[in-house]
């Protein structure tokens, strides 16, 4: 049935075939196909037991475990192919924009997400604070880098964060979240002829991150905490204190994505010595002030806010990855197997993103809206049709119902 599903979807068949050289033999490649297709089409929990049920006459959970935990296939090659396919489409889109003389900002959003777990025996699992739950929960925290450009959106890197106490217990070096973010920035190969804006929340704009951006020729747009020091016009104050000394007439108003903002901006230095533009802003009608800084001093407050809002694409990815692609469904104890599961989940996401871009490019309506969920539901529907067609074909050949059960539902 796996072969029938893959062959009935030409785009899926070509996509999976691009990864063939990462596997030493055909059985490994078949396991890869089964794993990725299972992630894409299964409607239940995408743990090994669920993935084994995703395809009639599918792989045994034990064989899937051996595939991710023991078999010797090239995970780096898999990631290289994933990245090249996504990056190739992005470069083509940038070339088309350049022919029309359109300057295109490229956003590299750094963020982290907590994947809740229940098994305390999982390697590197720990208690982390969950903002959504308002308490500490057991799980893994993943720091990610996400590329956002011309409507395209996909991860460029991800690293598992481990608390310092956990690292000491495991005898491995501790790496902070900003240091993991630095590693992602260092590994990122910028797109030619573009300006890269690194987007972060207030957890990440350390001196090292600012230095790394400056070294790579990137600009930073980041939220900062209200107690961050900002020096301008002879004053060296926490950013929240500027509201207390500014006259009412100092504030302006801008509109971003149909929302009105009250803003004040100034150029000055952070305590690290870096020159930045500070944008103090709040949505009209709300009390809470938010504070953004950027190292691109030429940007207007309106553009800074607009660029920063692109960061919410990452939240959309986290939601899809957890709810529809099984990011948090793994139950393996071994970290090596977990990292391979996440890699294969990223491959499944790449297929959906590439197909989403194809659908948008061929849409008659220039304002068409296509989501990853739309593409995934189409694939799931077509896969069910393939399964039904296979049953019909076997029945036409005279196989009994019991024999069909044994072939497809044993």
Positions of the model-derived regions?
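Short amphipathic alpha-helical "interface-anchor" segments enriched in bulky aromatics
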Residues: 114, 300-332
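Basic, amphipathic alpha-helical segments enriched in Lys/Arg and hydrophobic/aromatic residues
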Residues: 327-385
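Short, conserved catalytic/metal-binding motifs centered on acidic residues
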Residues: 51, 104-118, 145, 197-205, ...
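Gly/serine-rich nucleotide phosphate-binding loop at the start of the catalytic core
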Residues: 1-77, 82
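Electropositive, glycine- and tryptophan-enriched low-complexity nucleic-acid-binding patches
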Residues: 62-66, 71-72, 132-195, 276-291, ...
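Long, charge-rich low-complexity segments
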Residues: 80-91, 104, 384-410
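Active-site-proximal, Lys/Arg-enriched surface segment
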Residues: 69-156, 162-164, 262-263
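An internal, acidic/charged active-site-proximal segment
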Residues: 165-280, 358, 362-375, 408-410
């Amino acid at each position: 049935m796996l072969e029938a599903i893959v062959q009935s979807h030409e785009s899926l068949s070509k996509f999976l075939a691009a990864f063939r050289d990462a596997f030493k033999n055909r059985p490994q490649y078949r396991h890869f196909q089964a794993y990725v297709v299972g992630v894409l089409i299964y409607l239940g929990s995408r743990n090994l037991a669920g993935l084994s049920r995703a395809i009639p006459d599918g792989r045994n959970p034990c064989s899937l475990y051996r595939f991710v935990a023991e078999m010797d296939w090239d995970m780096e090659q898999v990631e290289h192919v994933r990245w090249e396919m996504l990056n190739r489409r992005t470069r083509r889109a940038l070339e088309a924009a350049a022919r029309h003389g359109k300057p295109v900002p490229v956003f590299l959003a750094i963020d982290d997400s907590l994947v809740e777990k229940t098994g305390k025996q999982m390697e590197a699992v720990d208690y982390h604070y969950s903002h959504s739950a308002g308490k500490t929960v057991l799980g893994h925290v993943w720091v990610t880098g996400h590329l956002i450009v011309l409507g395209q959106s996909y991860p460029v890197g991800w690293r598992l964060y481990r608390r310092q106490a956990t690292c000491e217990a495991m005898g491995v070096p501790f790496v902070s979240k900003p240091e993991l973010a630095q590693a992602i920035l260092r590994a990122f190969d910028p797109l030619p002829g573009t300006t890269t804006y690194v987007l972060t929340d207030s957890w990440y704009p350390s001196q090292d991150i600012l230095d790394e951006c400056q070294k790579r020729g990137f600009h930073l747009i980041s939220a900062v905490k209200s107690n961050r020091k900002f020096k301008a016009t002879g004053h060296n104050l926490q950013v929240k204190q500027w509201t207390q000394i500014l006259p009412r007439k100092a504030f302006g108003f801008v509109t971003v994505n149909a929302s009105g903002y009250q803003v004040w901006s100034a150029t000055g230095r952070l305590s690290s010595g870096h020159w930045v533009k500070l944008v103090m802003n709040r949505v009209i009608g709300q009390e809470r002030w938010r504070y953004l800084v950027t190292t691109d001093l030429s940007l207007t407050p309106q553009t800074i806010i607009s660029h920063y809002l692109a960061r919410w694409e990452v939240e959309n990815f986290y939601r899809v990855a957890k709810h529809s692609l099984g990011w948090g469904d793994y139950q393996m104890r071994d970290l090596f197997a977990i990292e391979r599961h996440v890699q294969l989940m990223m491959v499944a996401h790449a297929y959906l993103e590439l197909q989403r871009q194809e659908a948008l490019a061929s849409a008659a309506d220039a304002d068409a809206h296509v989501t990853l969920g739309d593409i995934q539901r189409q694939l799931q529907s077509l896969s069910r049709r393939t399964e039904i067609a296979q049953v019909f074909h076997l029945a036409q050949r005279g196989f009994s119902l019991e024999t069909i059960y044994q072939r497809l539902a044993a």
